[in-house]
Amino acid sequence: MMNSMKITSFLWFVDNADEAAKFYASVFKGKIISNTKLKDTPSGPNTYLVTIKLANMTFTLINGGKAKGFTQFSAATSFVVNCKDQKEVNYYWSSLLKGGGKPSRCGWLTDKYGLTWQVIPDQMPKYLAGSNKQGRDRAMKAMLKMAKLDIDKIRQAYMEE
């Protein structure tokens, strides 16, 4: 018998899950599957569950208010966006930073809602784990200087062009 287990990411927002769901659906060309207002919850009258589908993954966002034991998001958990080319890197990088996100290093950023993302070109393993040790070292040094990853510069460092 086949296991049909499915994993859904569940994200707790203090008060803007609906807004965040719309933002992520627009960035990833996804869709909102459901938006349910919950009644009589300890979190108060503005508690919503919003389920969205992004790139064949399901996410449920809750507008749960401030609750003991639930903290803001941190970089300890991140979502990786695998990009086929630099054009996709540029698109996701600028889209996820829109409205107050903060860039970090090595392709990492935090969006305006506090979620951390890694925007990574598919070609990265070719240069960071390639057979040429000196090339790998140069590619790593080039990457460590970057916020948004530039695959051409990383390739050039690897190839020593």
How would you describe each model-predicted region?
Residues 4-8, 74-78:
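Short, solvent-exposed beta-strand edge segments and adjacent coil->beta transition regions
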Residues 8, 47-48, 104-106:
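Short loop/turn microsegments at loop-to-beta-strand junctions
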Residues 11-57:
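Core segments of cupin and vicinal oxygen chelate
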Residues 17-18, 26-27, 54-56, 76-116, ...:
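Vicinal oxygen chelate
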Residues 62-65:
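Membrane-helix exit/interface motif
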Residues 71, 124-138:
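A short, polar/charged loop-to-alpha-helix boundary motif
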Residues 136-161:
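Acidic/histidine-enriched, glycine/proline-rich intrinsically disordered or flexible terminal extensions
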